[in-house]
């Protein structure tokens, strides 16, 4: 590895950060998939910076991004360094074996860099069928069958080509240093290792994550990852093509095909032909802000645009938070009722109409049409509607319903640099530990299970999100950039992990900042709530009992669960930038 003066400075900073890892984790003054396991609550008040801010899911990753900006790098440079470190220290959630959606504001335009995985050329709509029926969900997840062509490396390279300031190789140095010299297993990673029943069946993962007796390595154990360090050195010196062609690509393909019970069809040609795509951001207005995010294949911004389009006529500001458990603010029953009913309607439309727009016509303008949303919003009454039906927006094609579960392991990064460039990036390998296949020190995704397992619904209509060769599965990832509607000034960067619950985690946070006058950290801290067109989901242990009973009286089927969001964000304030991180996970923010 080239040891430049910049690289040496970054390496020293990262080693210092590694030594202080534990202290860094504390802040300054219908078909339902269970949320990712909780790992405790750490009170967080937010982090203040004047000139720039980095927020991410792990302190070591935040330190890497911070050092890049201090060295003169852009927000995109910092995001790349953060993601590479997350591959190492938060392997259950994201990494180079997965995909990413990266939203960039350069002061002129919102660009959407699409690094979503693609289905192999040999994939068919029978991929997840067995004996004429959809296979059990985890029978599809674990093994090579679920692995799509990873997109994160290509997406990072495309973003760097357009917006980077530092040399590509320099961005790899923090992750290489940590991989070679070691990092400490965090409590969250240790807890997830202890709960996962599949990962240890992979020999490479077992050797890395588990003791000789089969028990998971404990929190506080120092891990080195020389195999990943070697991969990162190769990518640093040879560029992204080295990931998609040659020995690294061949190793991925071999791993996918070698699974003893559930091999996949990913090929060397699939990897060599993968390209990240540059798309225009999708925006909608709410109150005094313009909210911008990702278009299809993401469903997140479109669903949020529908939800808030239906809520625009409601006086949500009057429905102030109530006193919750431990005296902390919590949304009122009426606010949860209105939001959750709007979310039911949006999810019904999402499940019917949204998929990869390169393969199916997504009626975006119709779904966001104000008259259509007014009609949909008028369906919200005093009592819960239960299961919502999809509407018929203008120019909508006939489509079948698809309620494919979307699993909750993902990571979010928000960064604003000294020049005002902003990044909102959500990255994922899909389920916790992805396909449970480890190759060269990193885990491969299981993103193909985000497709519908069936190609037709019960009425015989084609499902928009069915498996097709080369197609990108629908996502709920919702990286957002929020602007003042009149001045155009950037207000916030935010997003979250959480599978399809991402939409509600981010939606709750927008309600807090846009309607209730909360700062971003306060809004993130609110108990989570929402519906995915099934039961009304409320955060266990933090939602007031009176709120639960009122919702039940309104006809809501209530489910209390951990609701482990992982929101990160950056918000403009009078002092510069407020960094915010979810108290439900291990993230922090750091700026200057």
Regions found by a protein language model. Give the residues of each.
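Extended C-terminal subregions enriched in glycine
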Residues: 470-472, 506, 515-562
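Bacterial N-terminal signal peptides that target proteins for export
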Residues: 1-8
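Active-site rim segments in enzyme catalytic domains, especially the processed small/beta chain
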Residues: 88-95, 101-105, 109-112, 262-267, ...
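Short, small/polar residue-rich loop motifs at catalytic or cofactor-binding pockets
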Residues: 278, 407-410, 475-477
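Noncatalytic scaffold domains of N-terminal-nucleophile
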Residues: 23-63, 67, 75-245, 250-295, ...
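Internal maturation/activation junctions in enzymes
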Residues: 32, 316-428, 437, 582
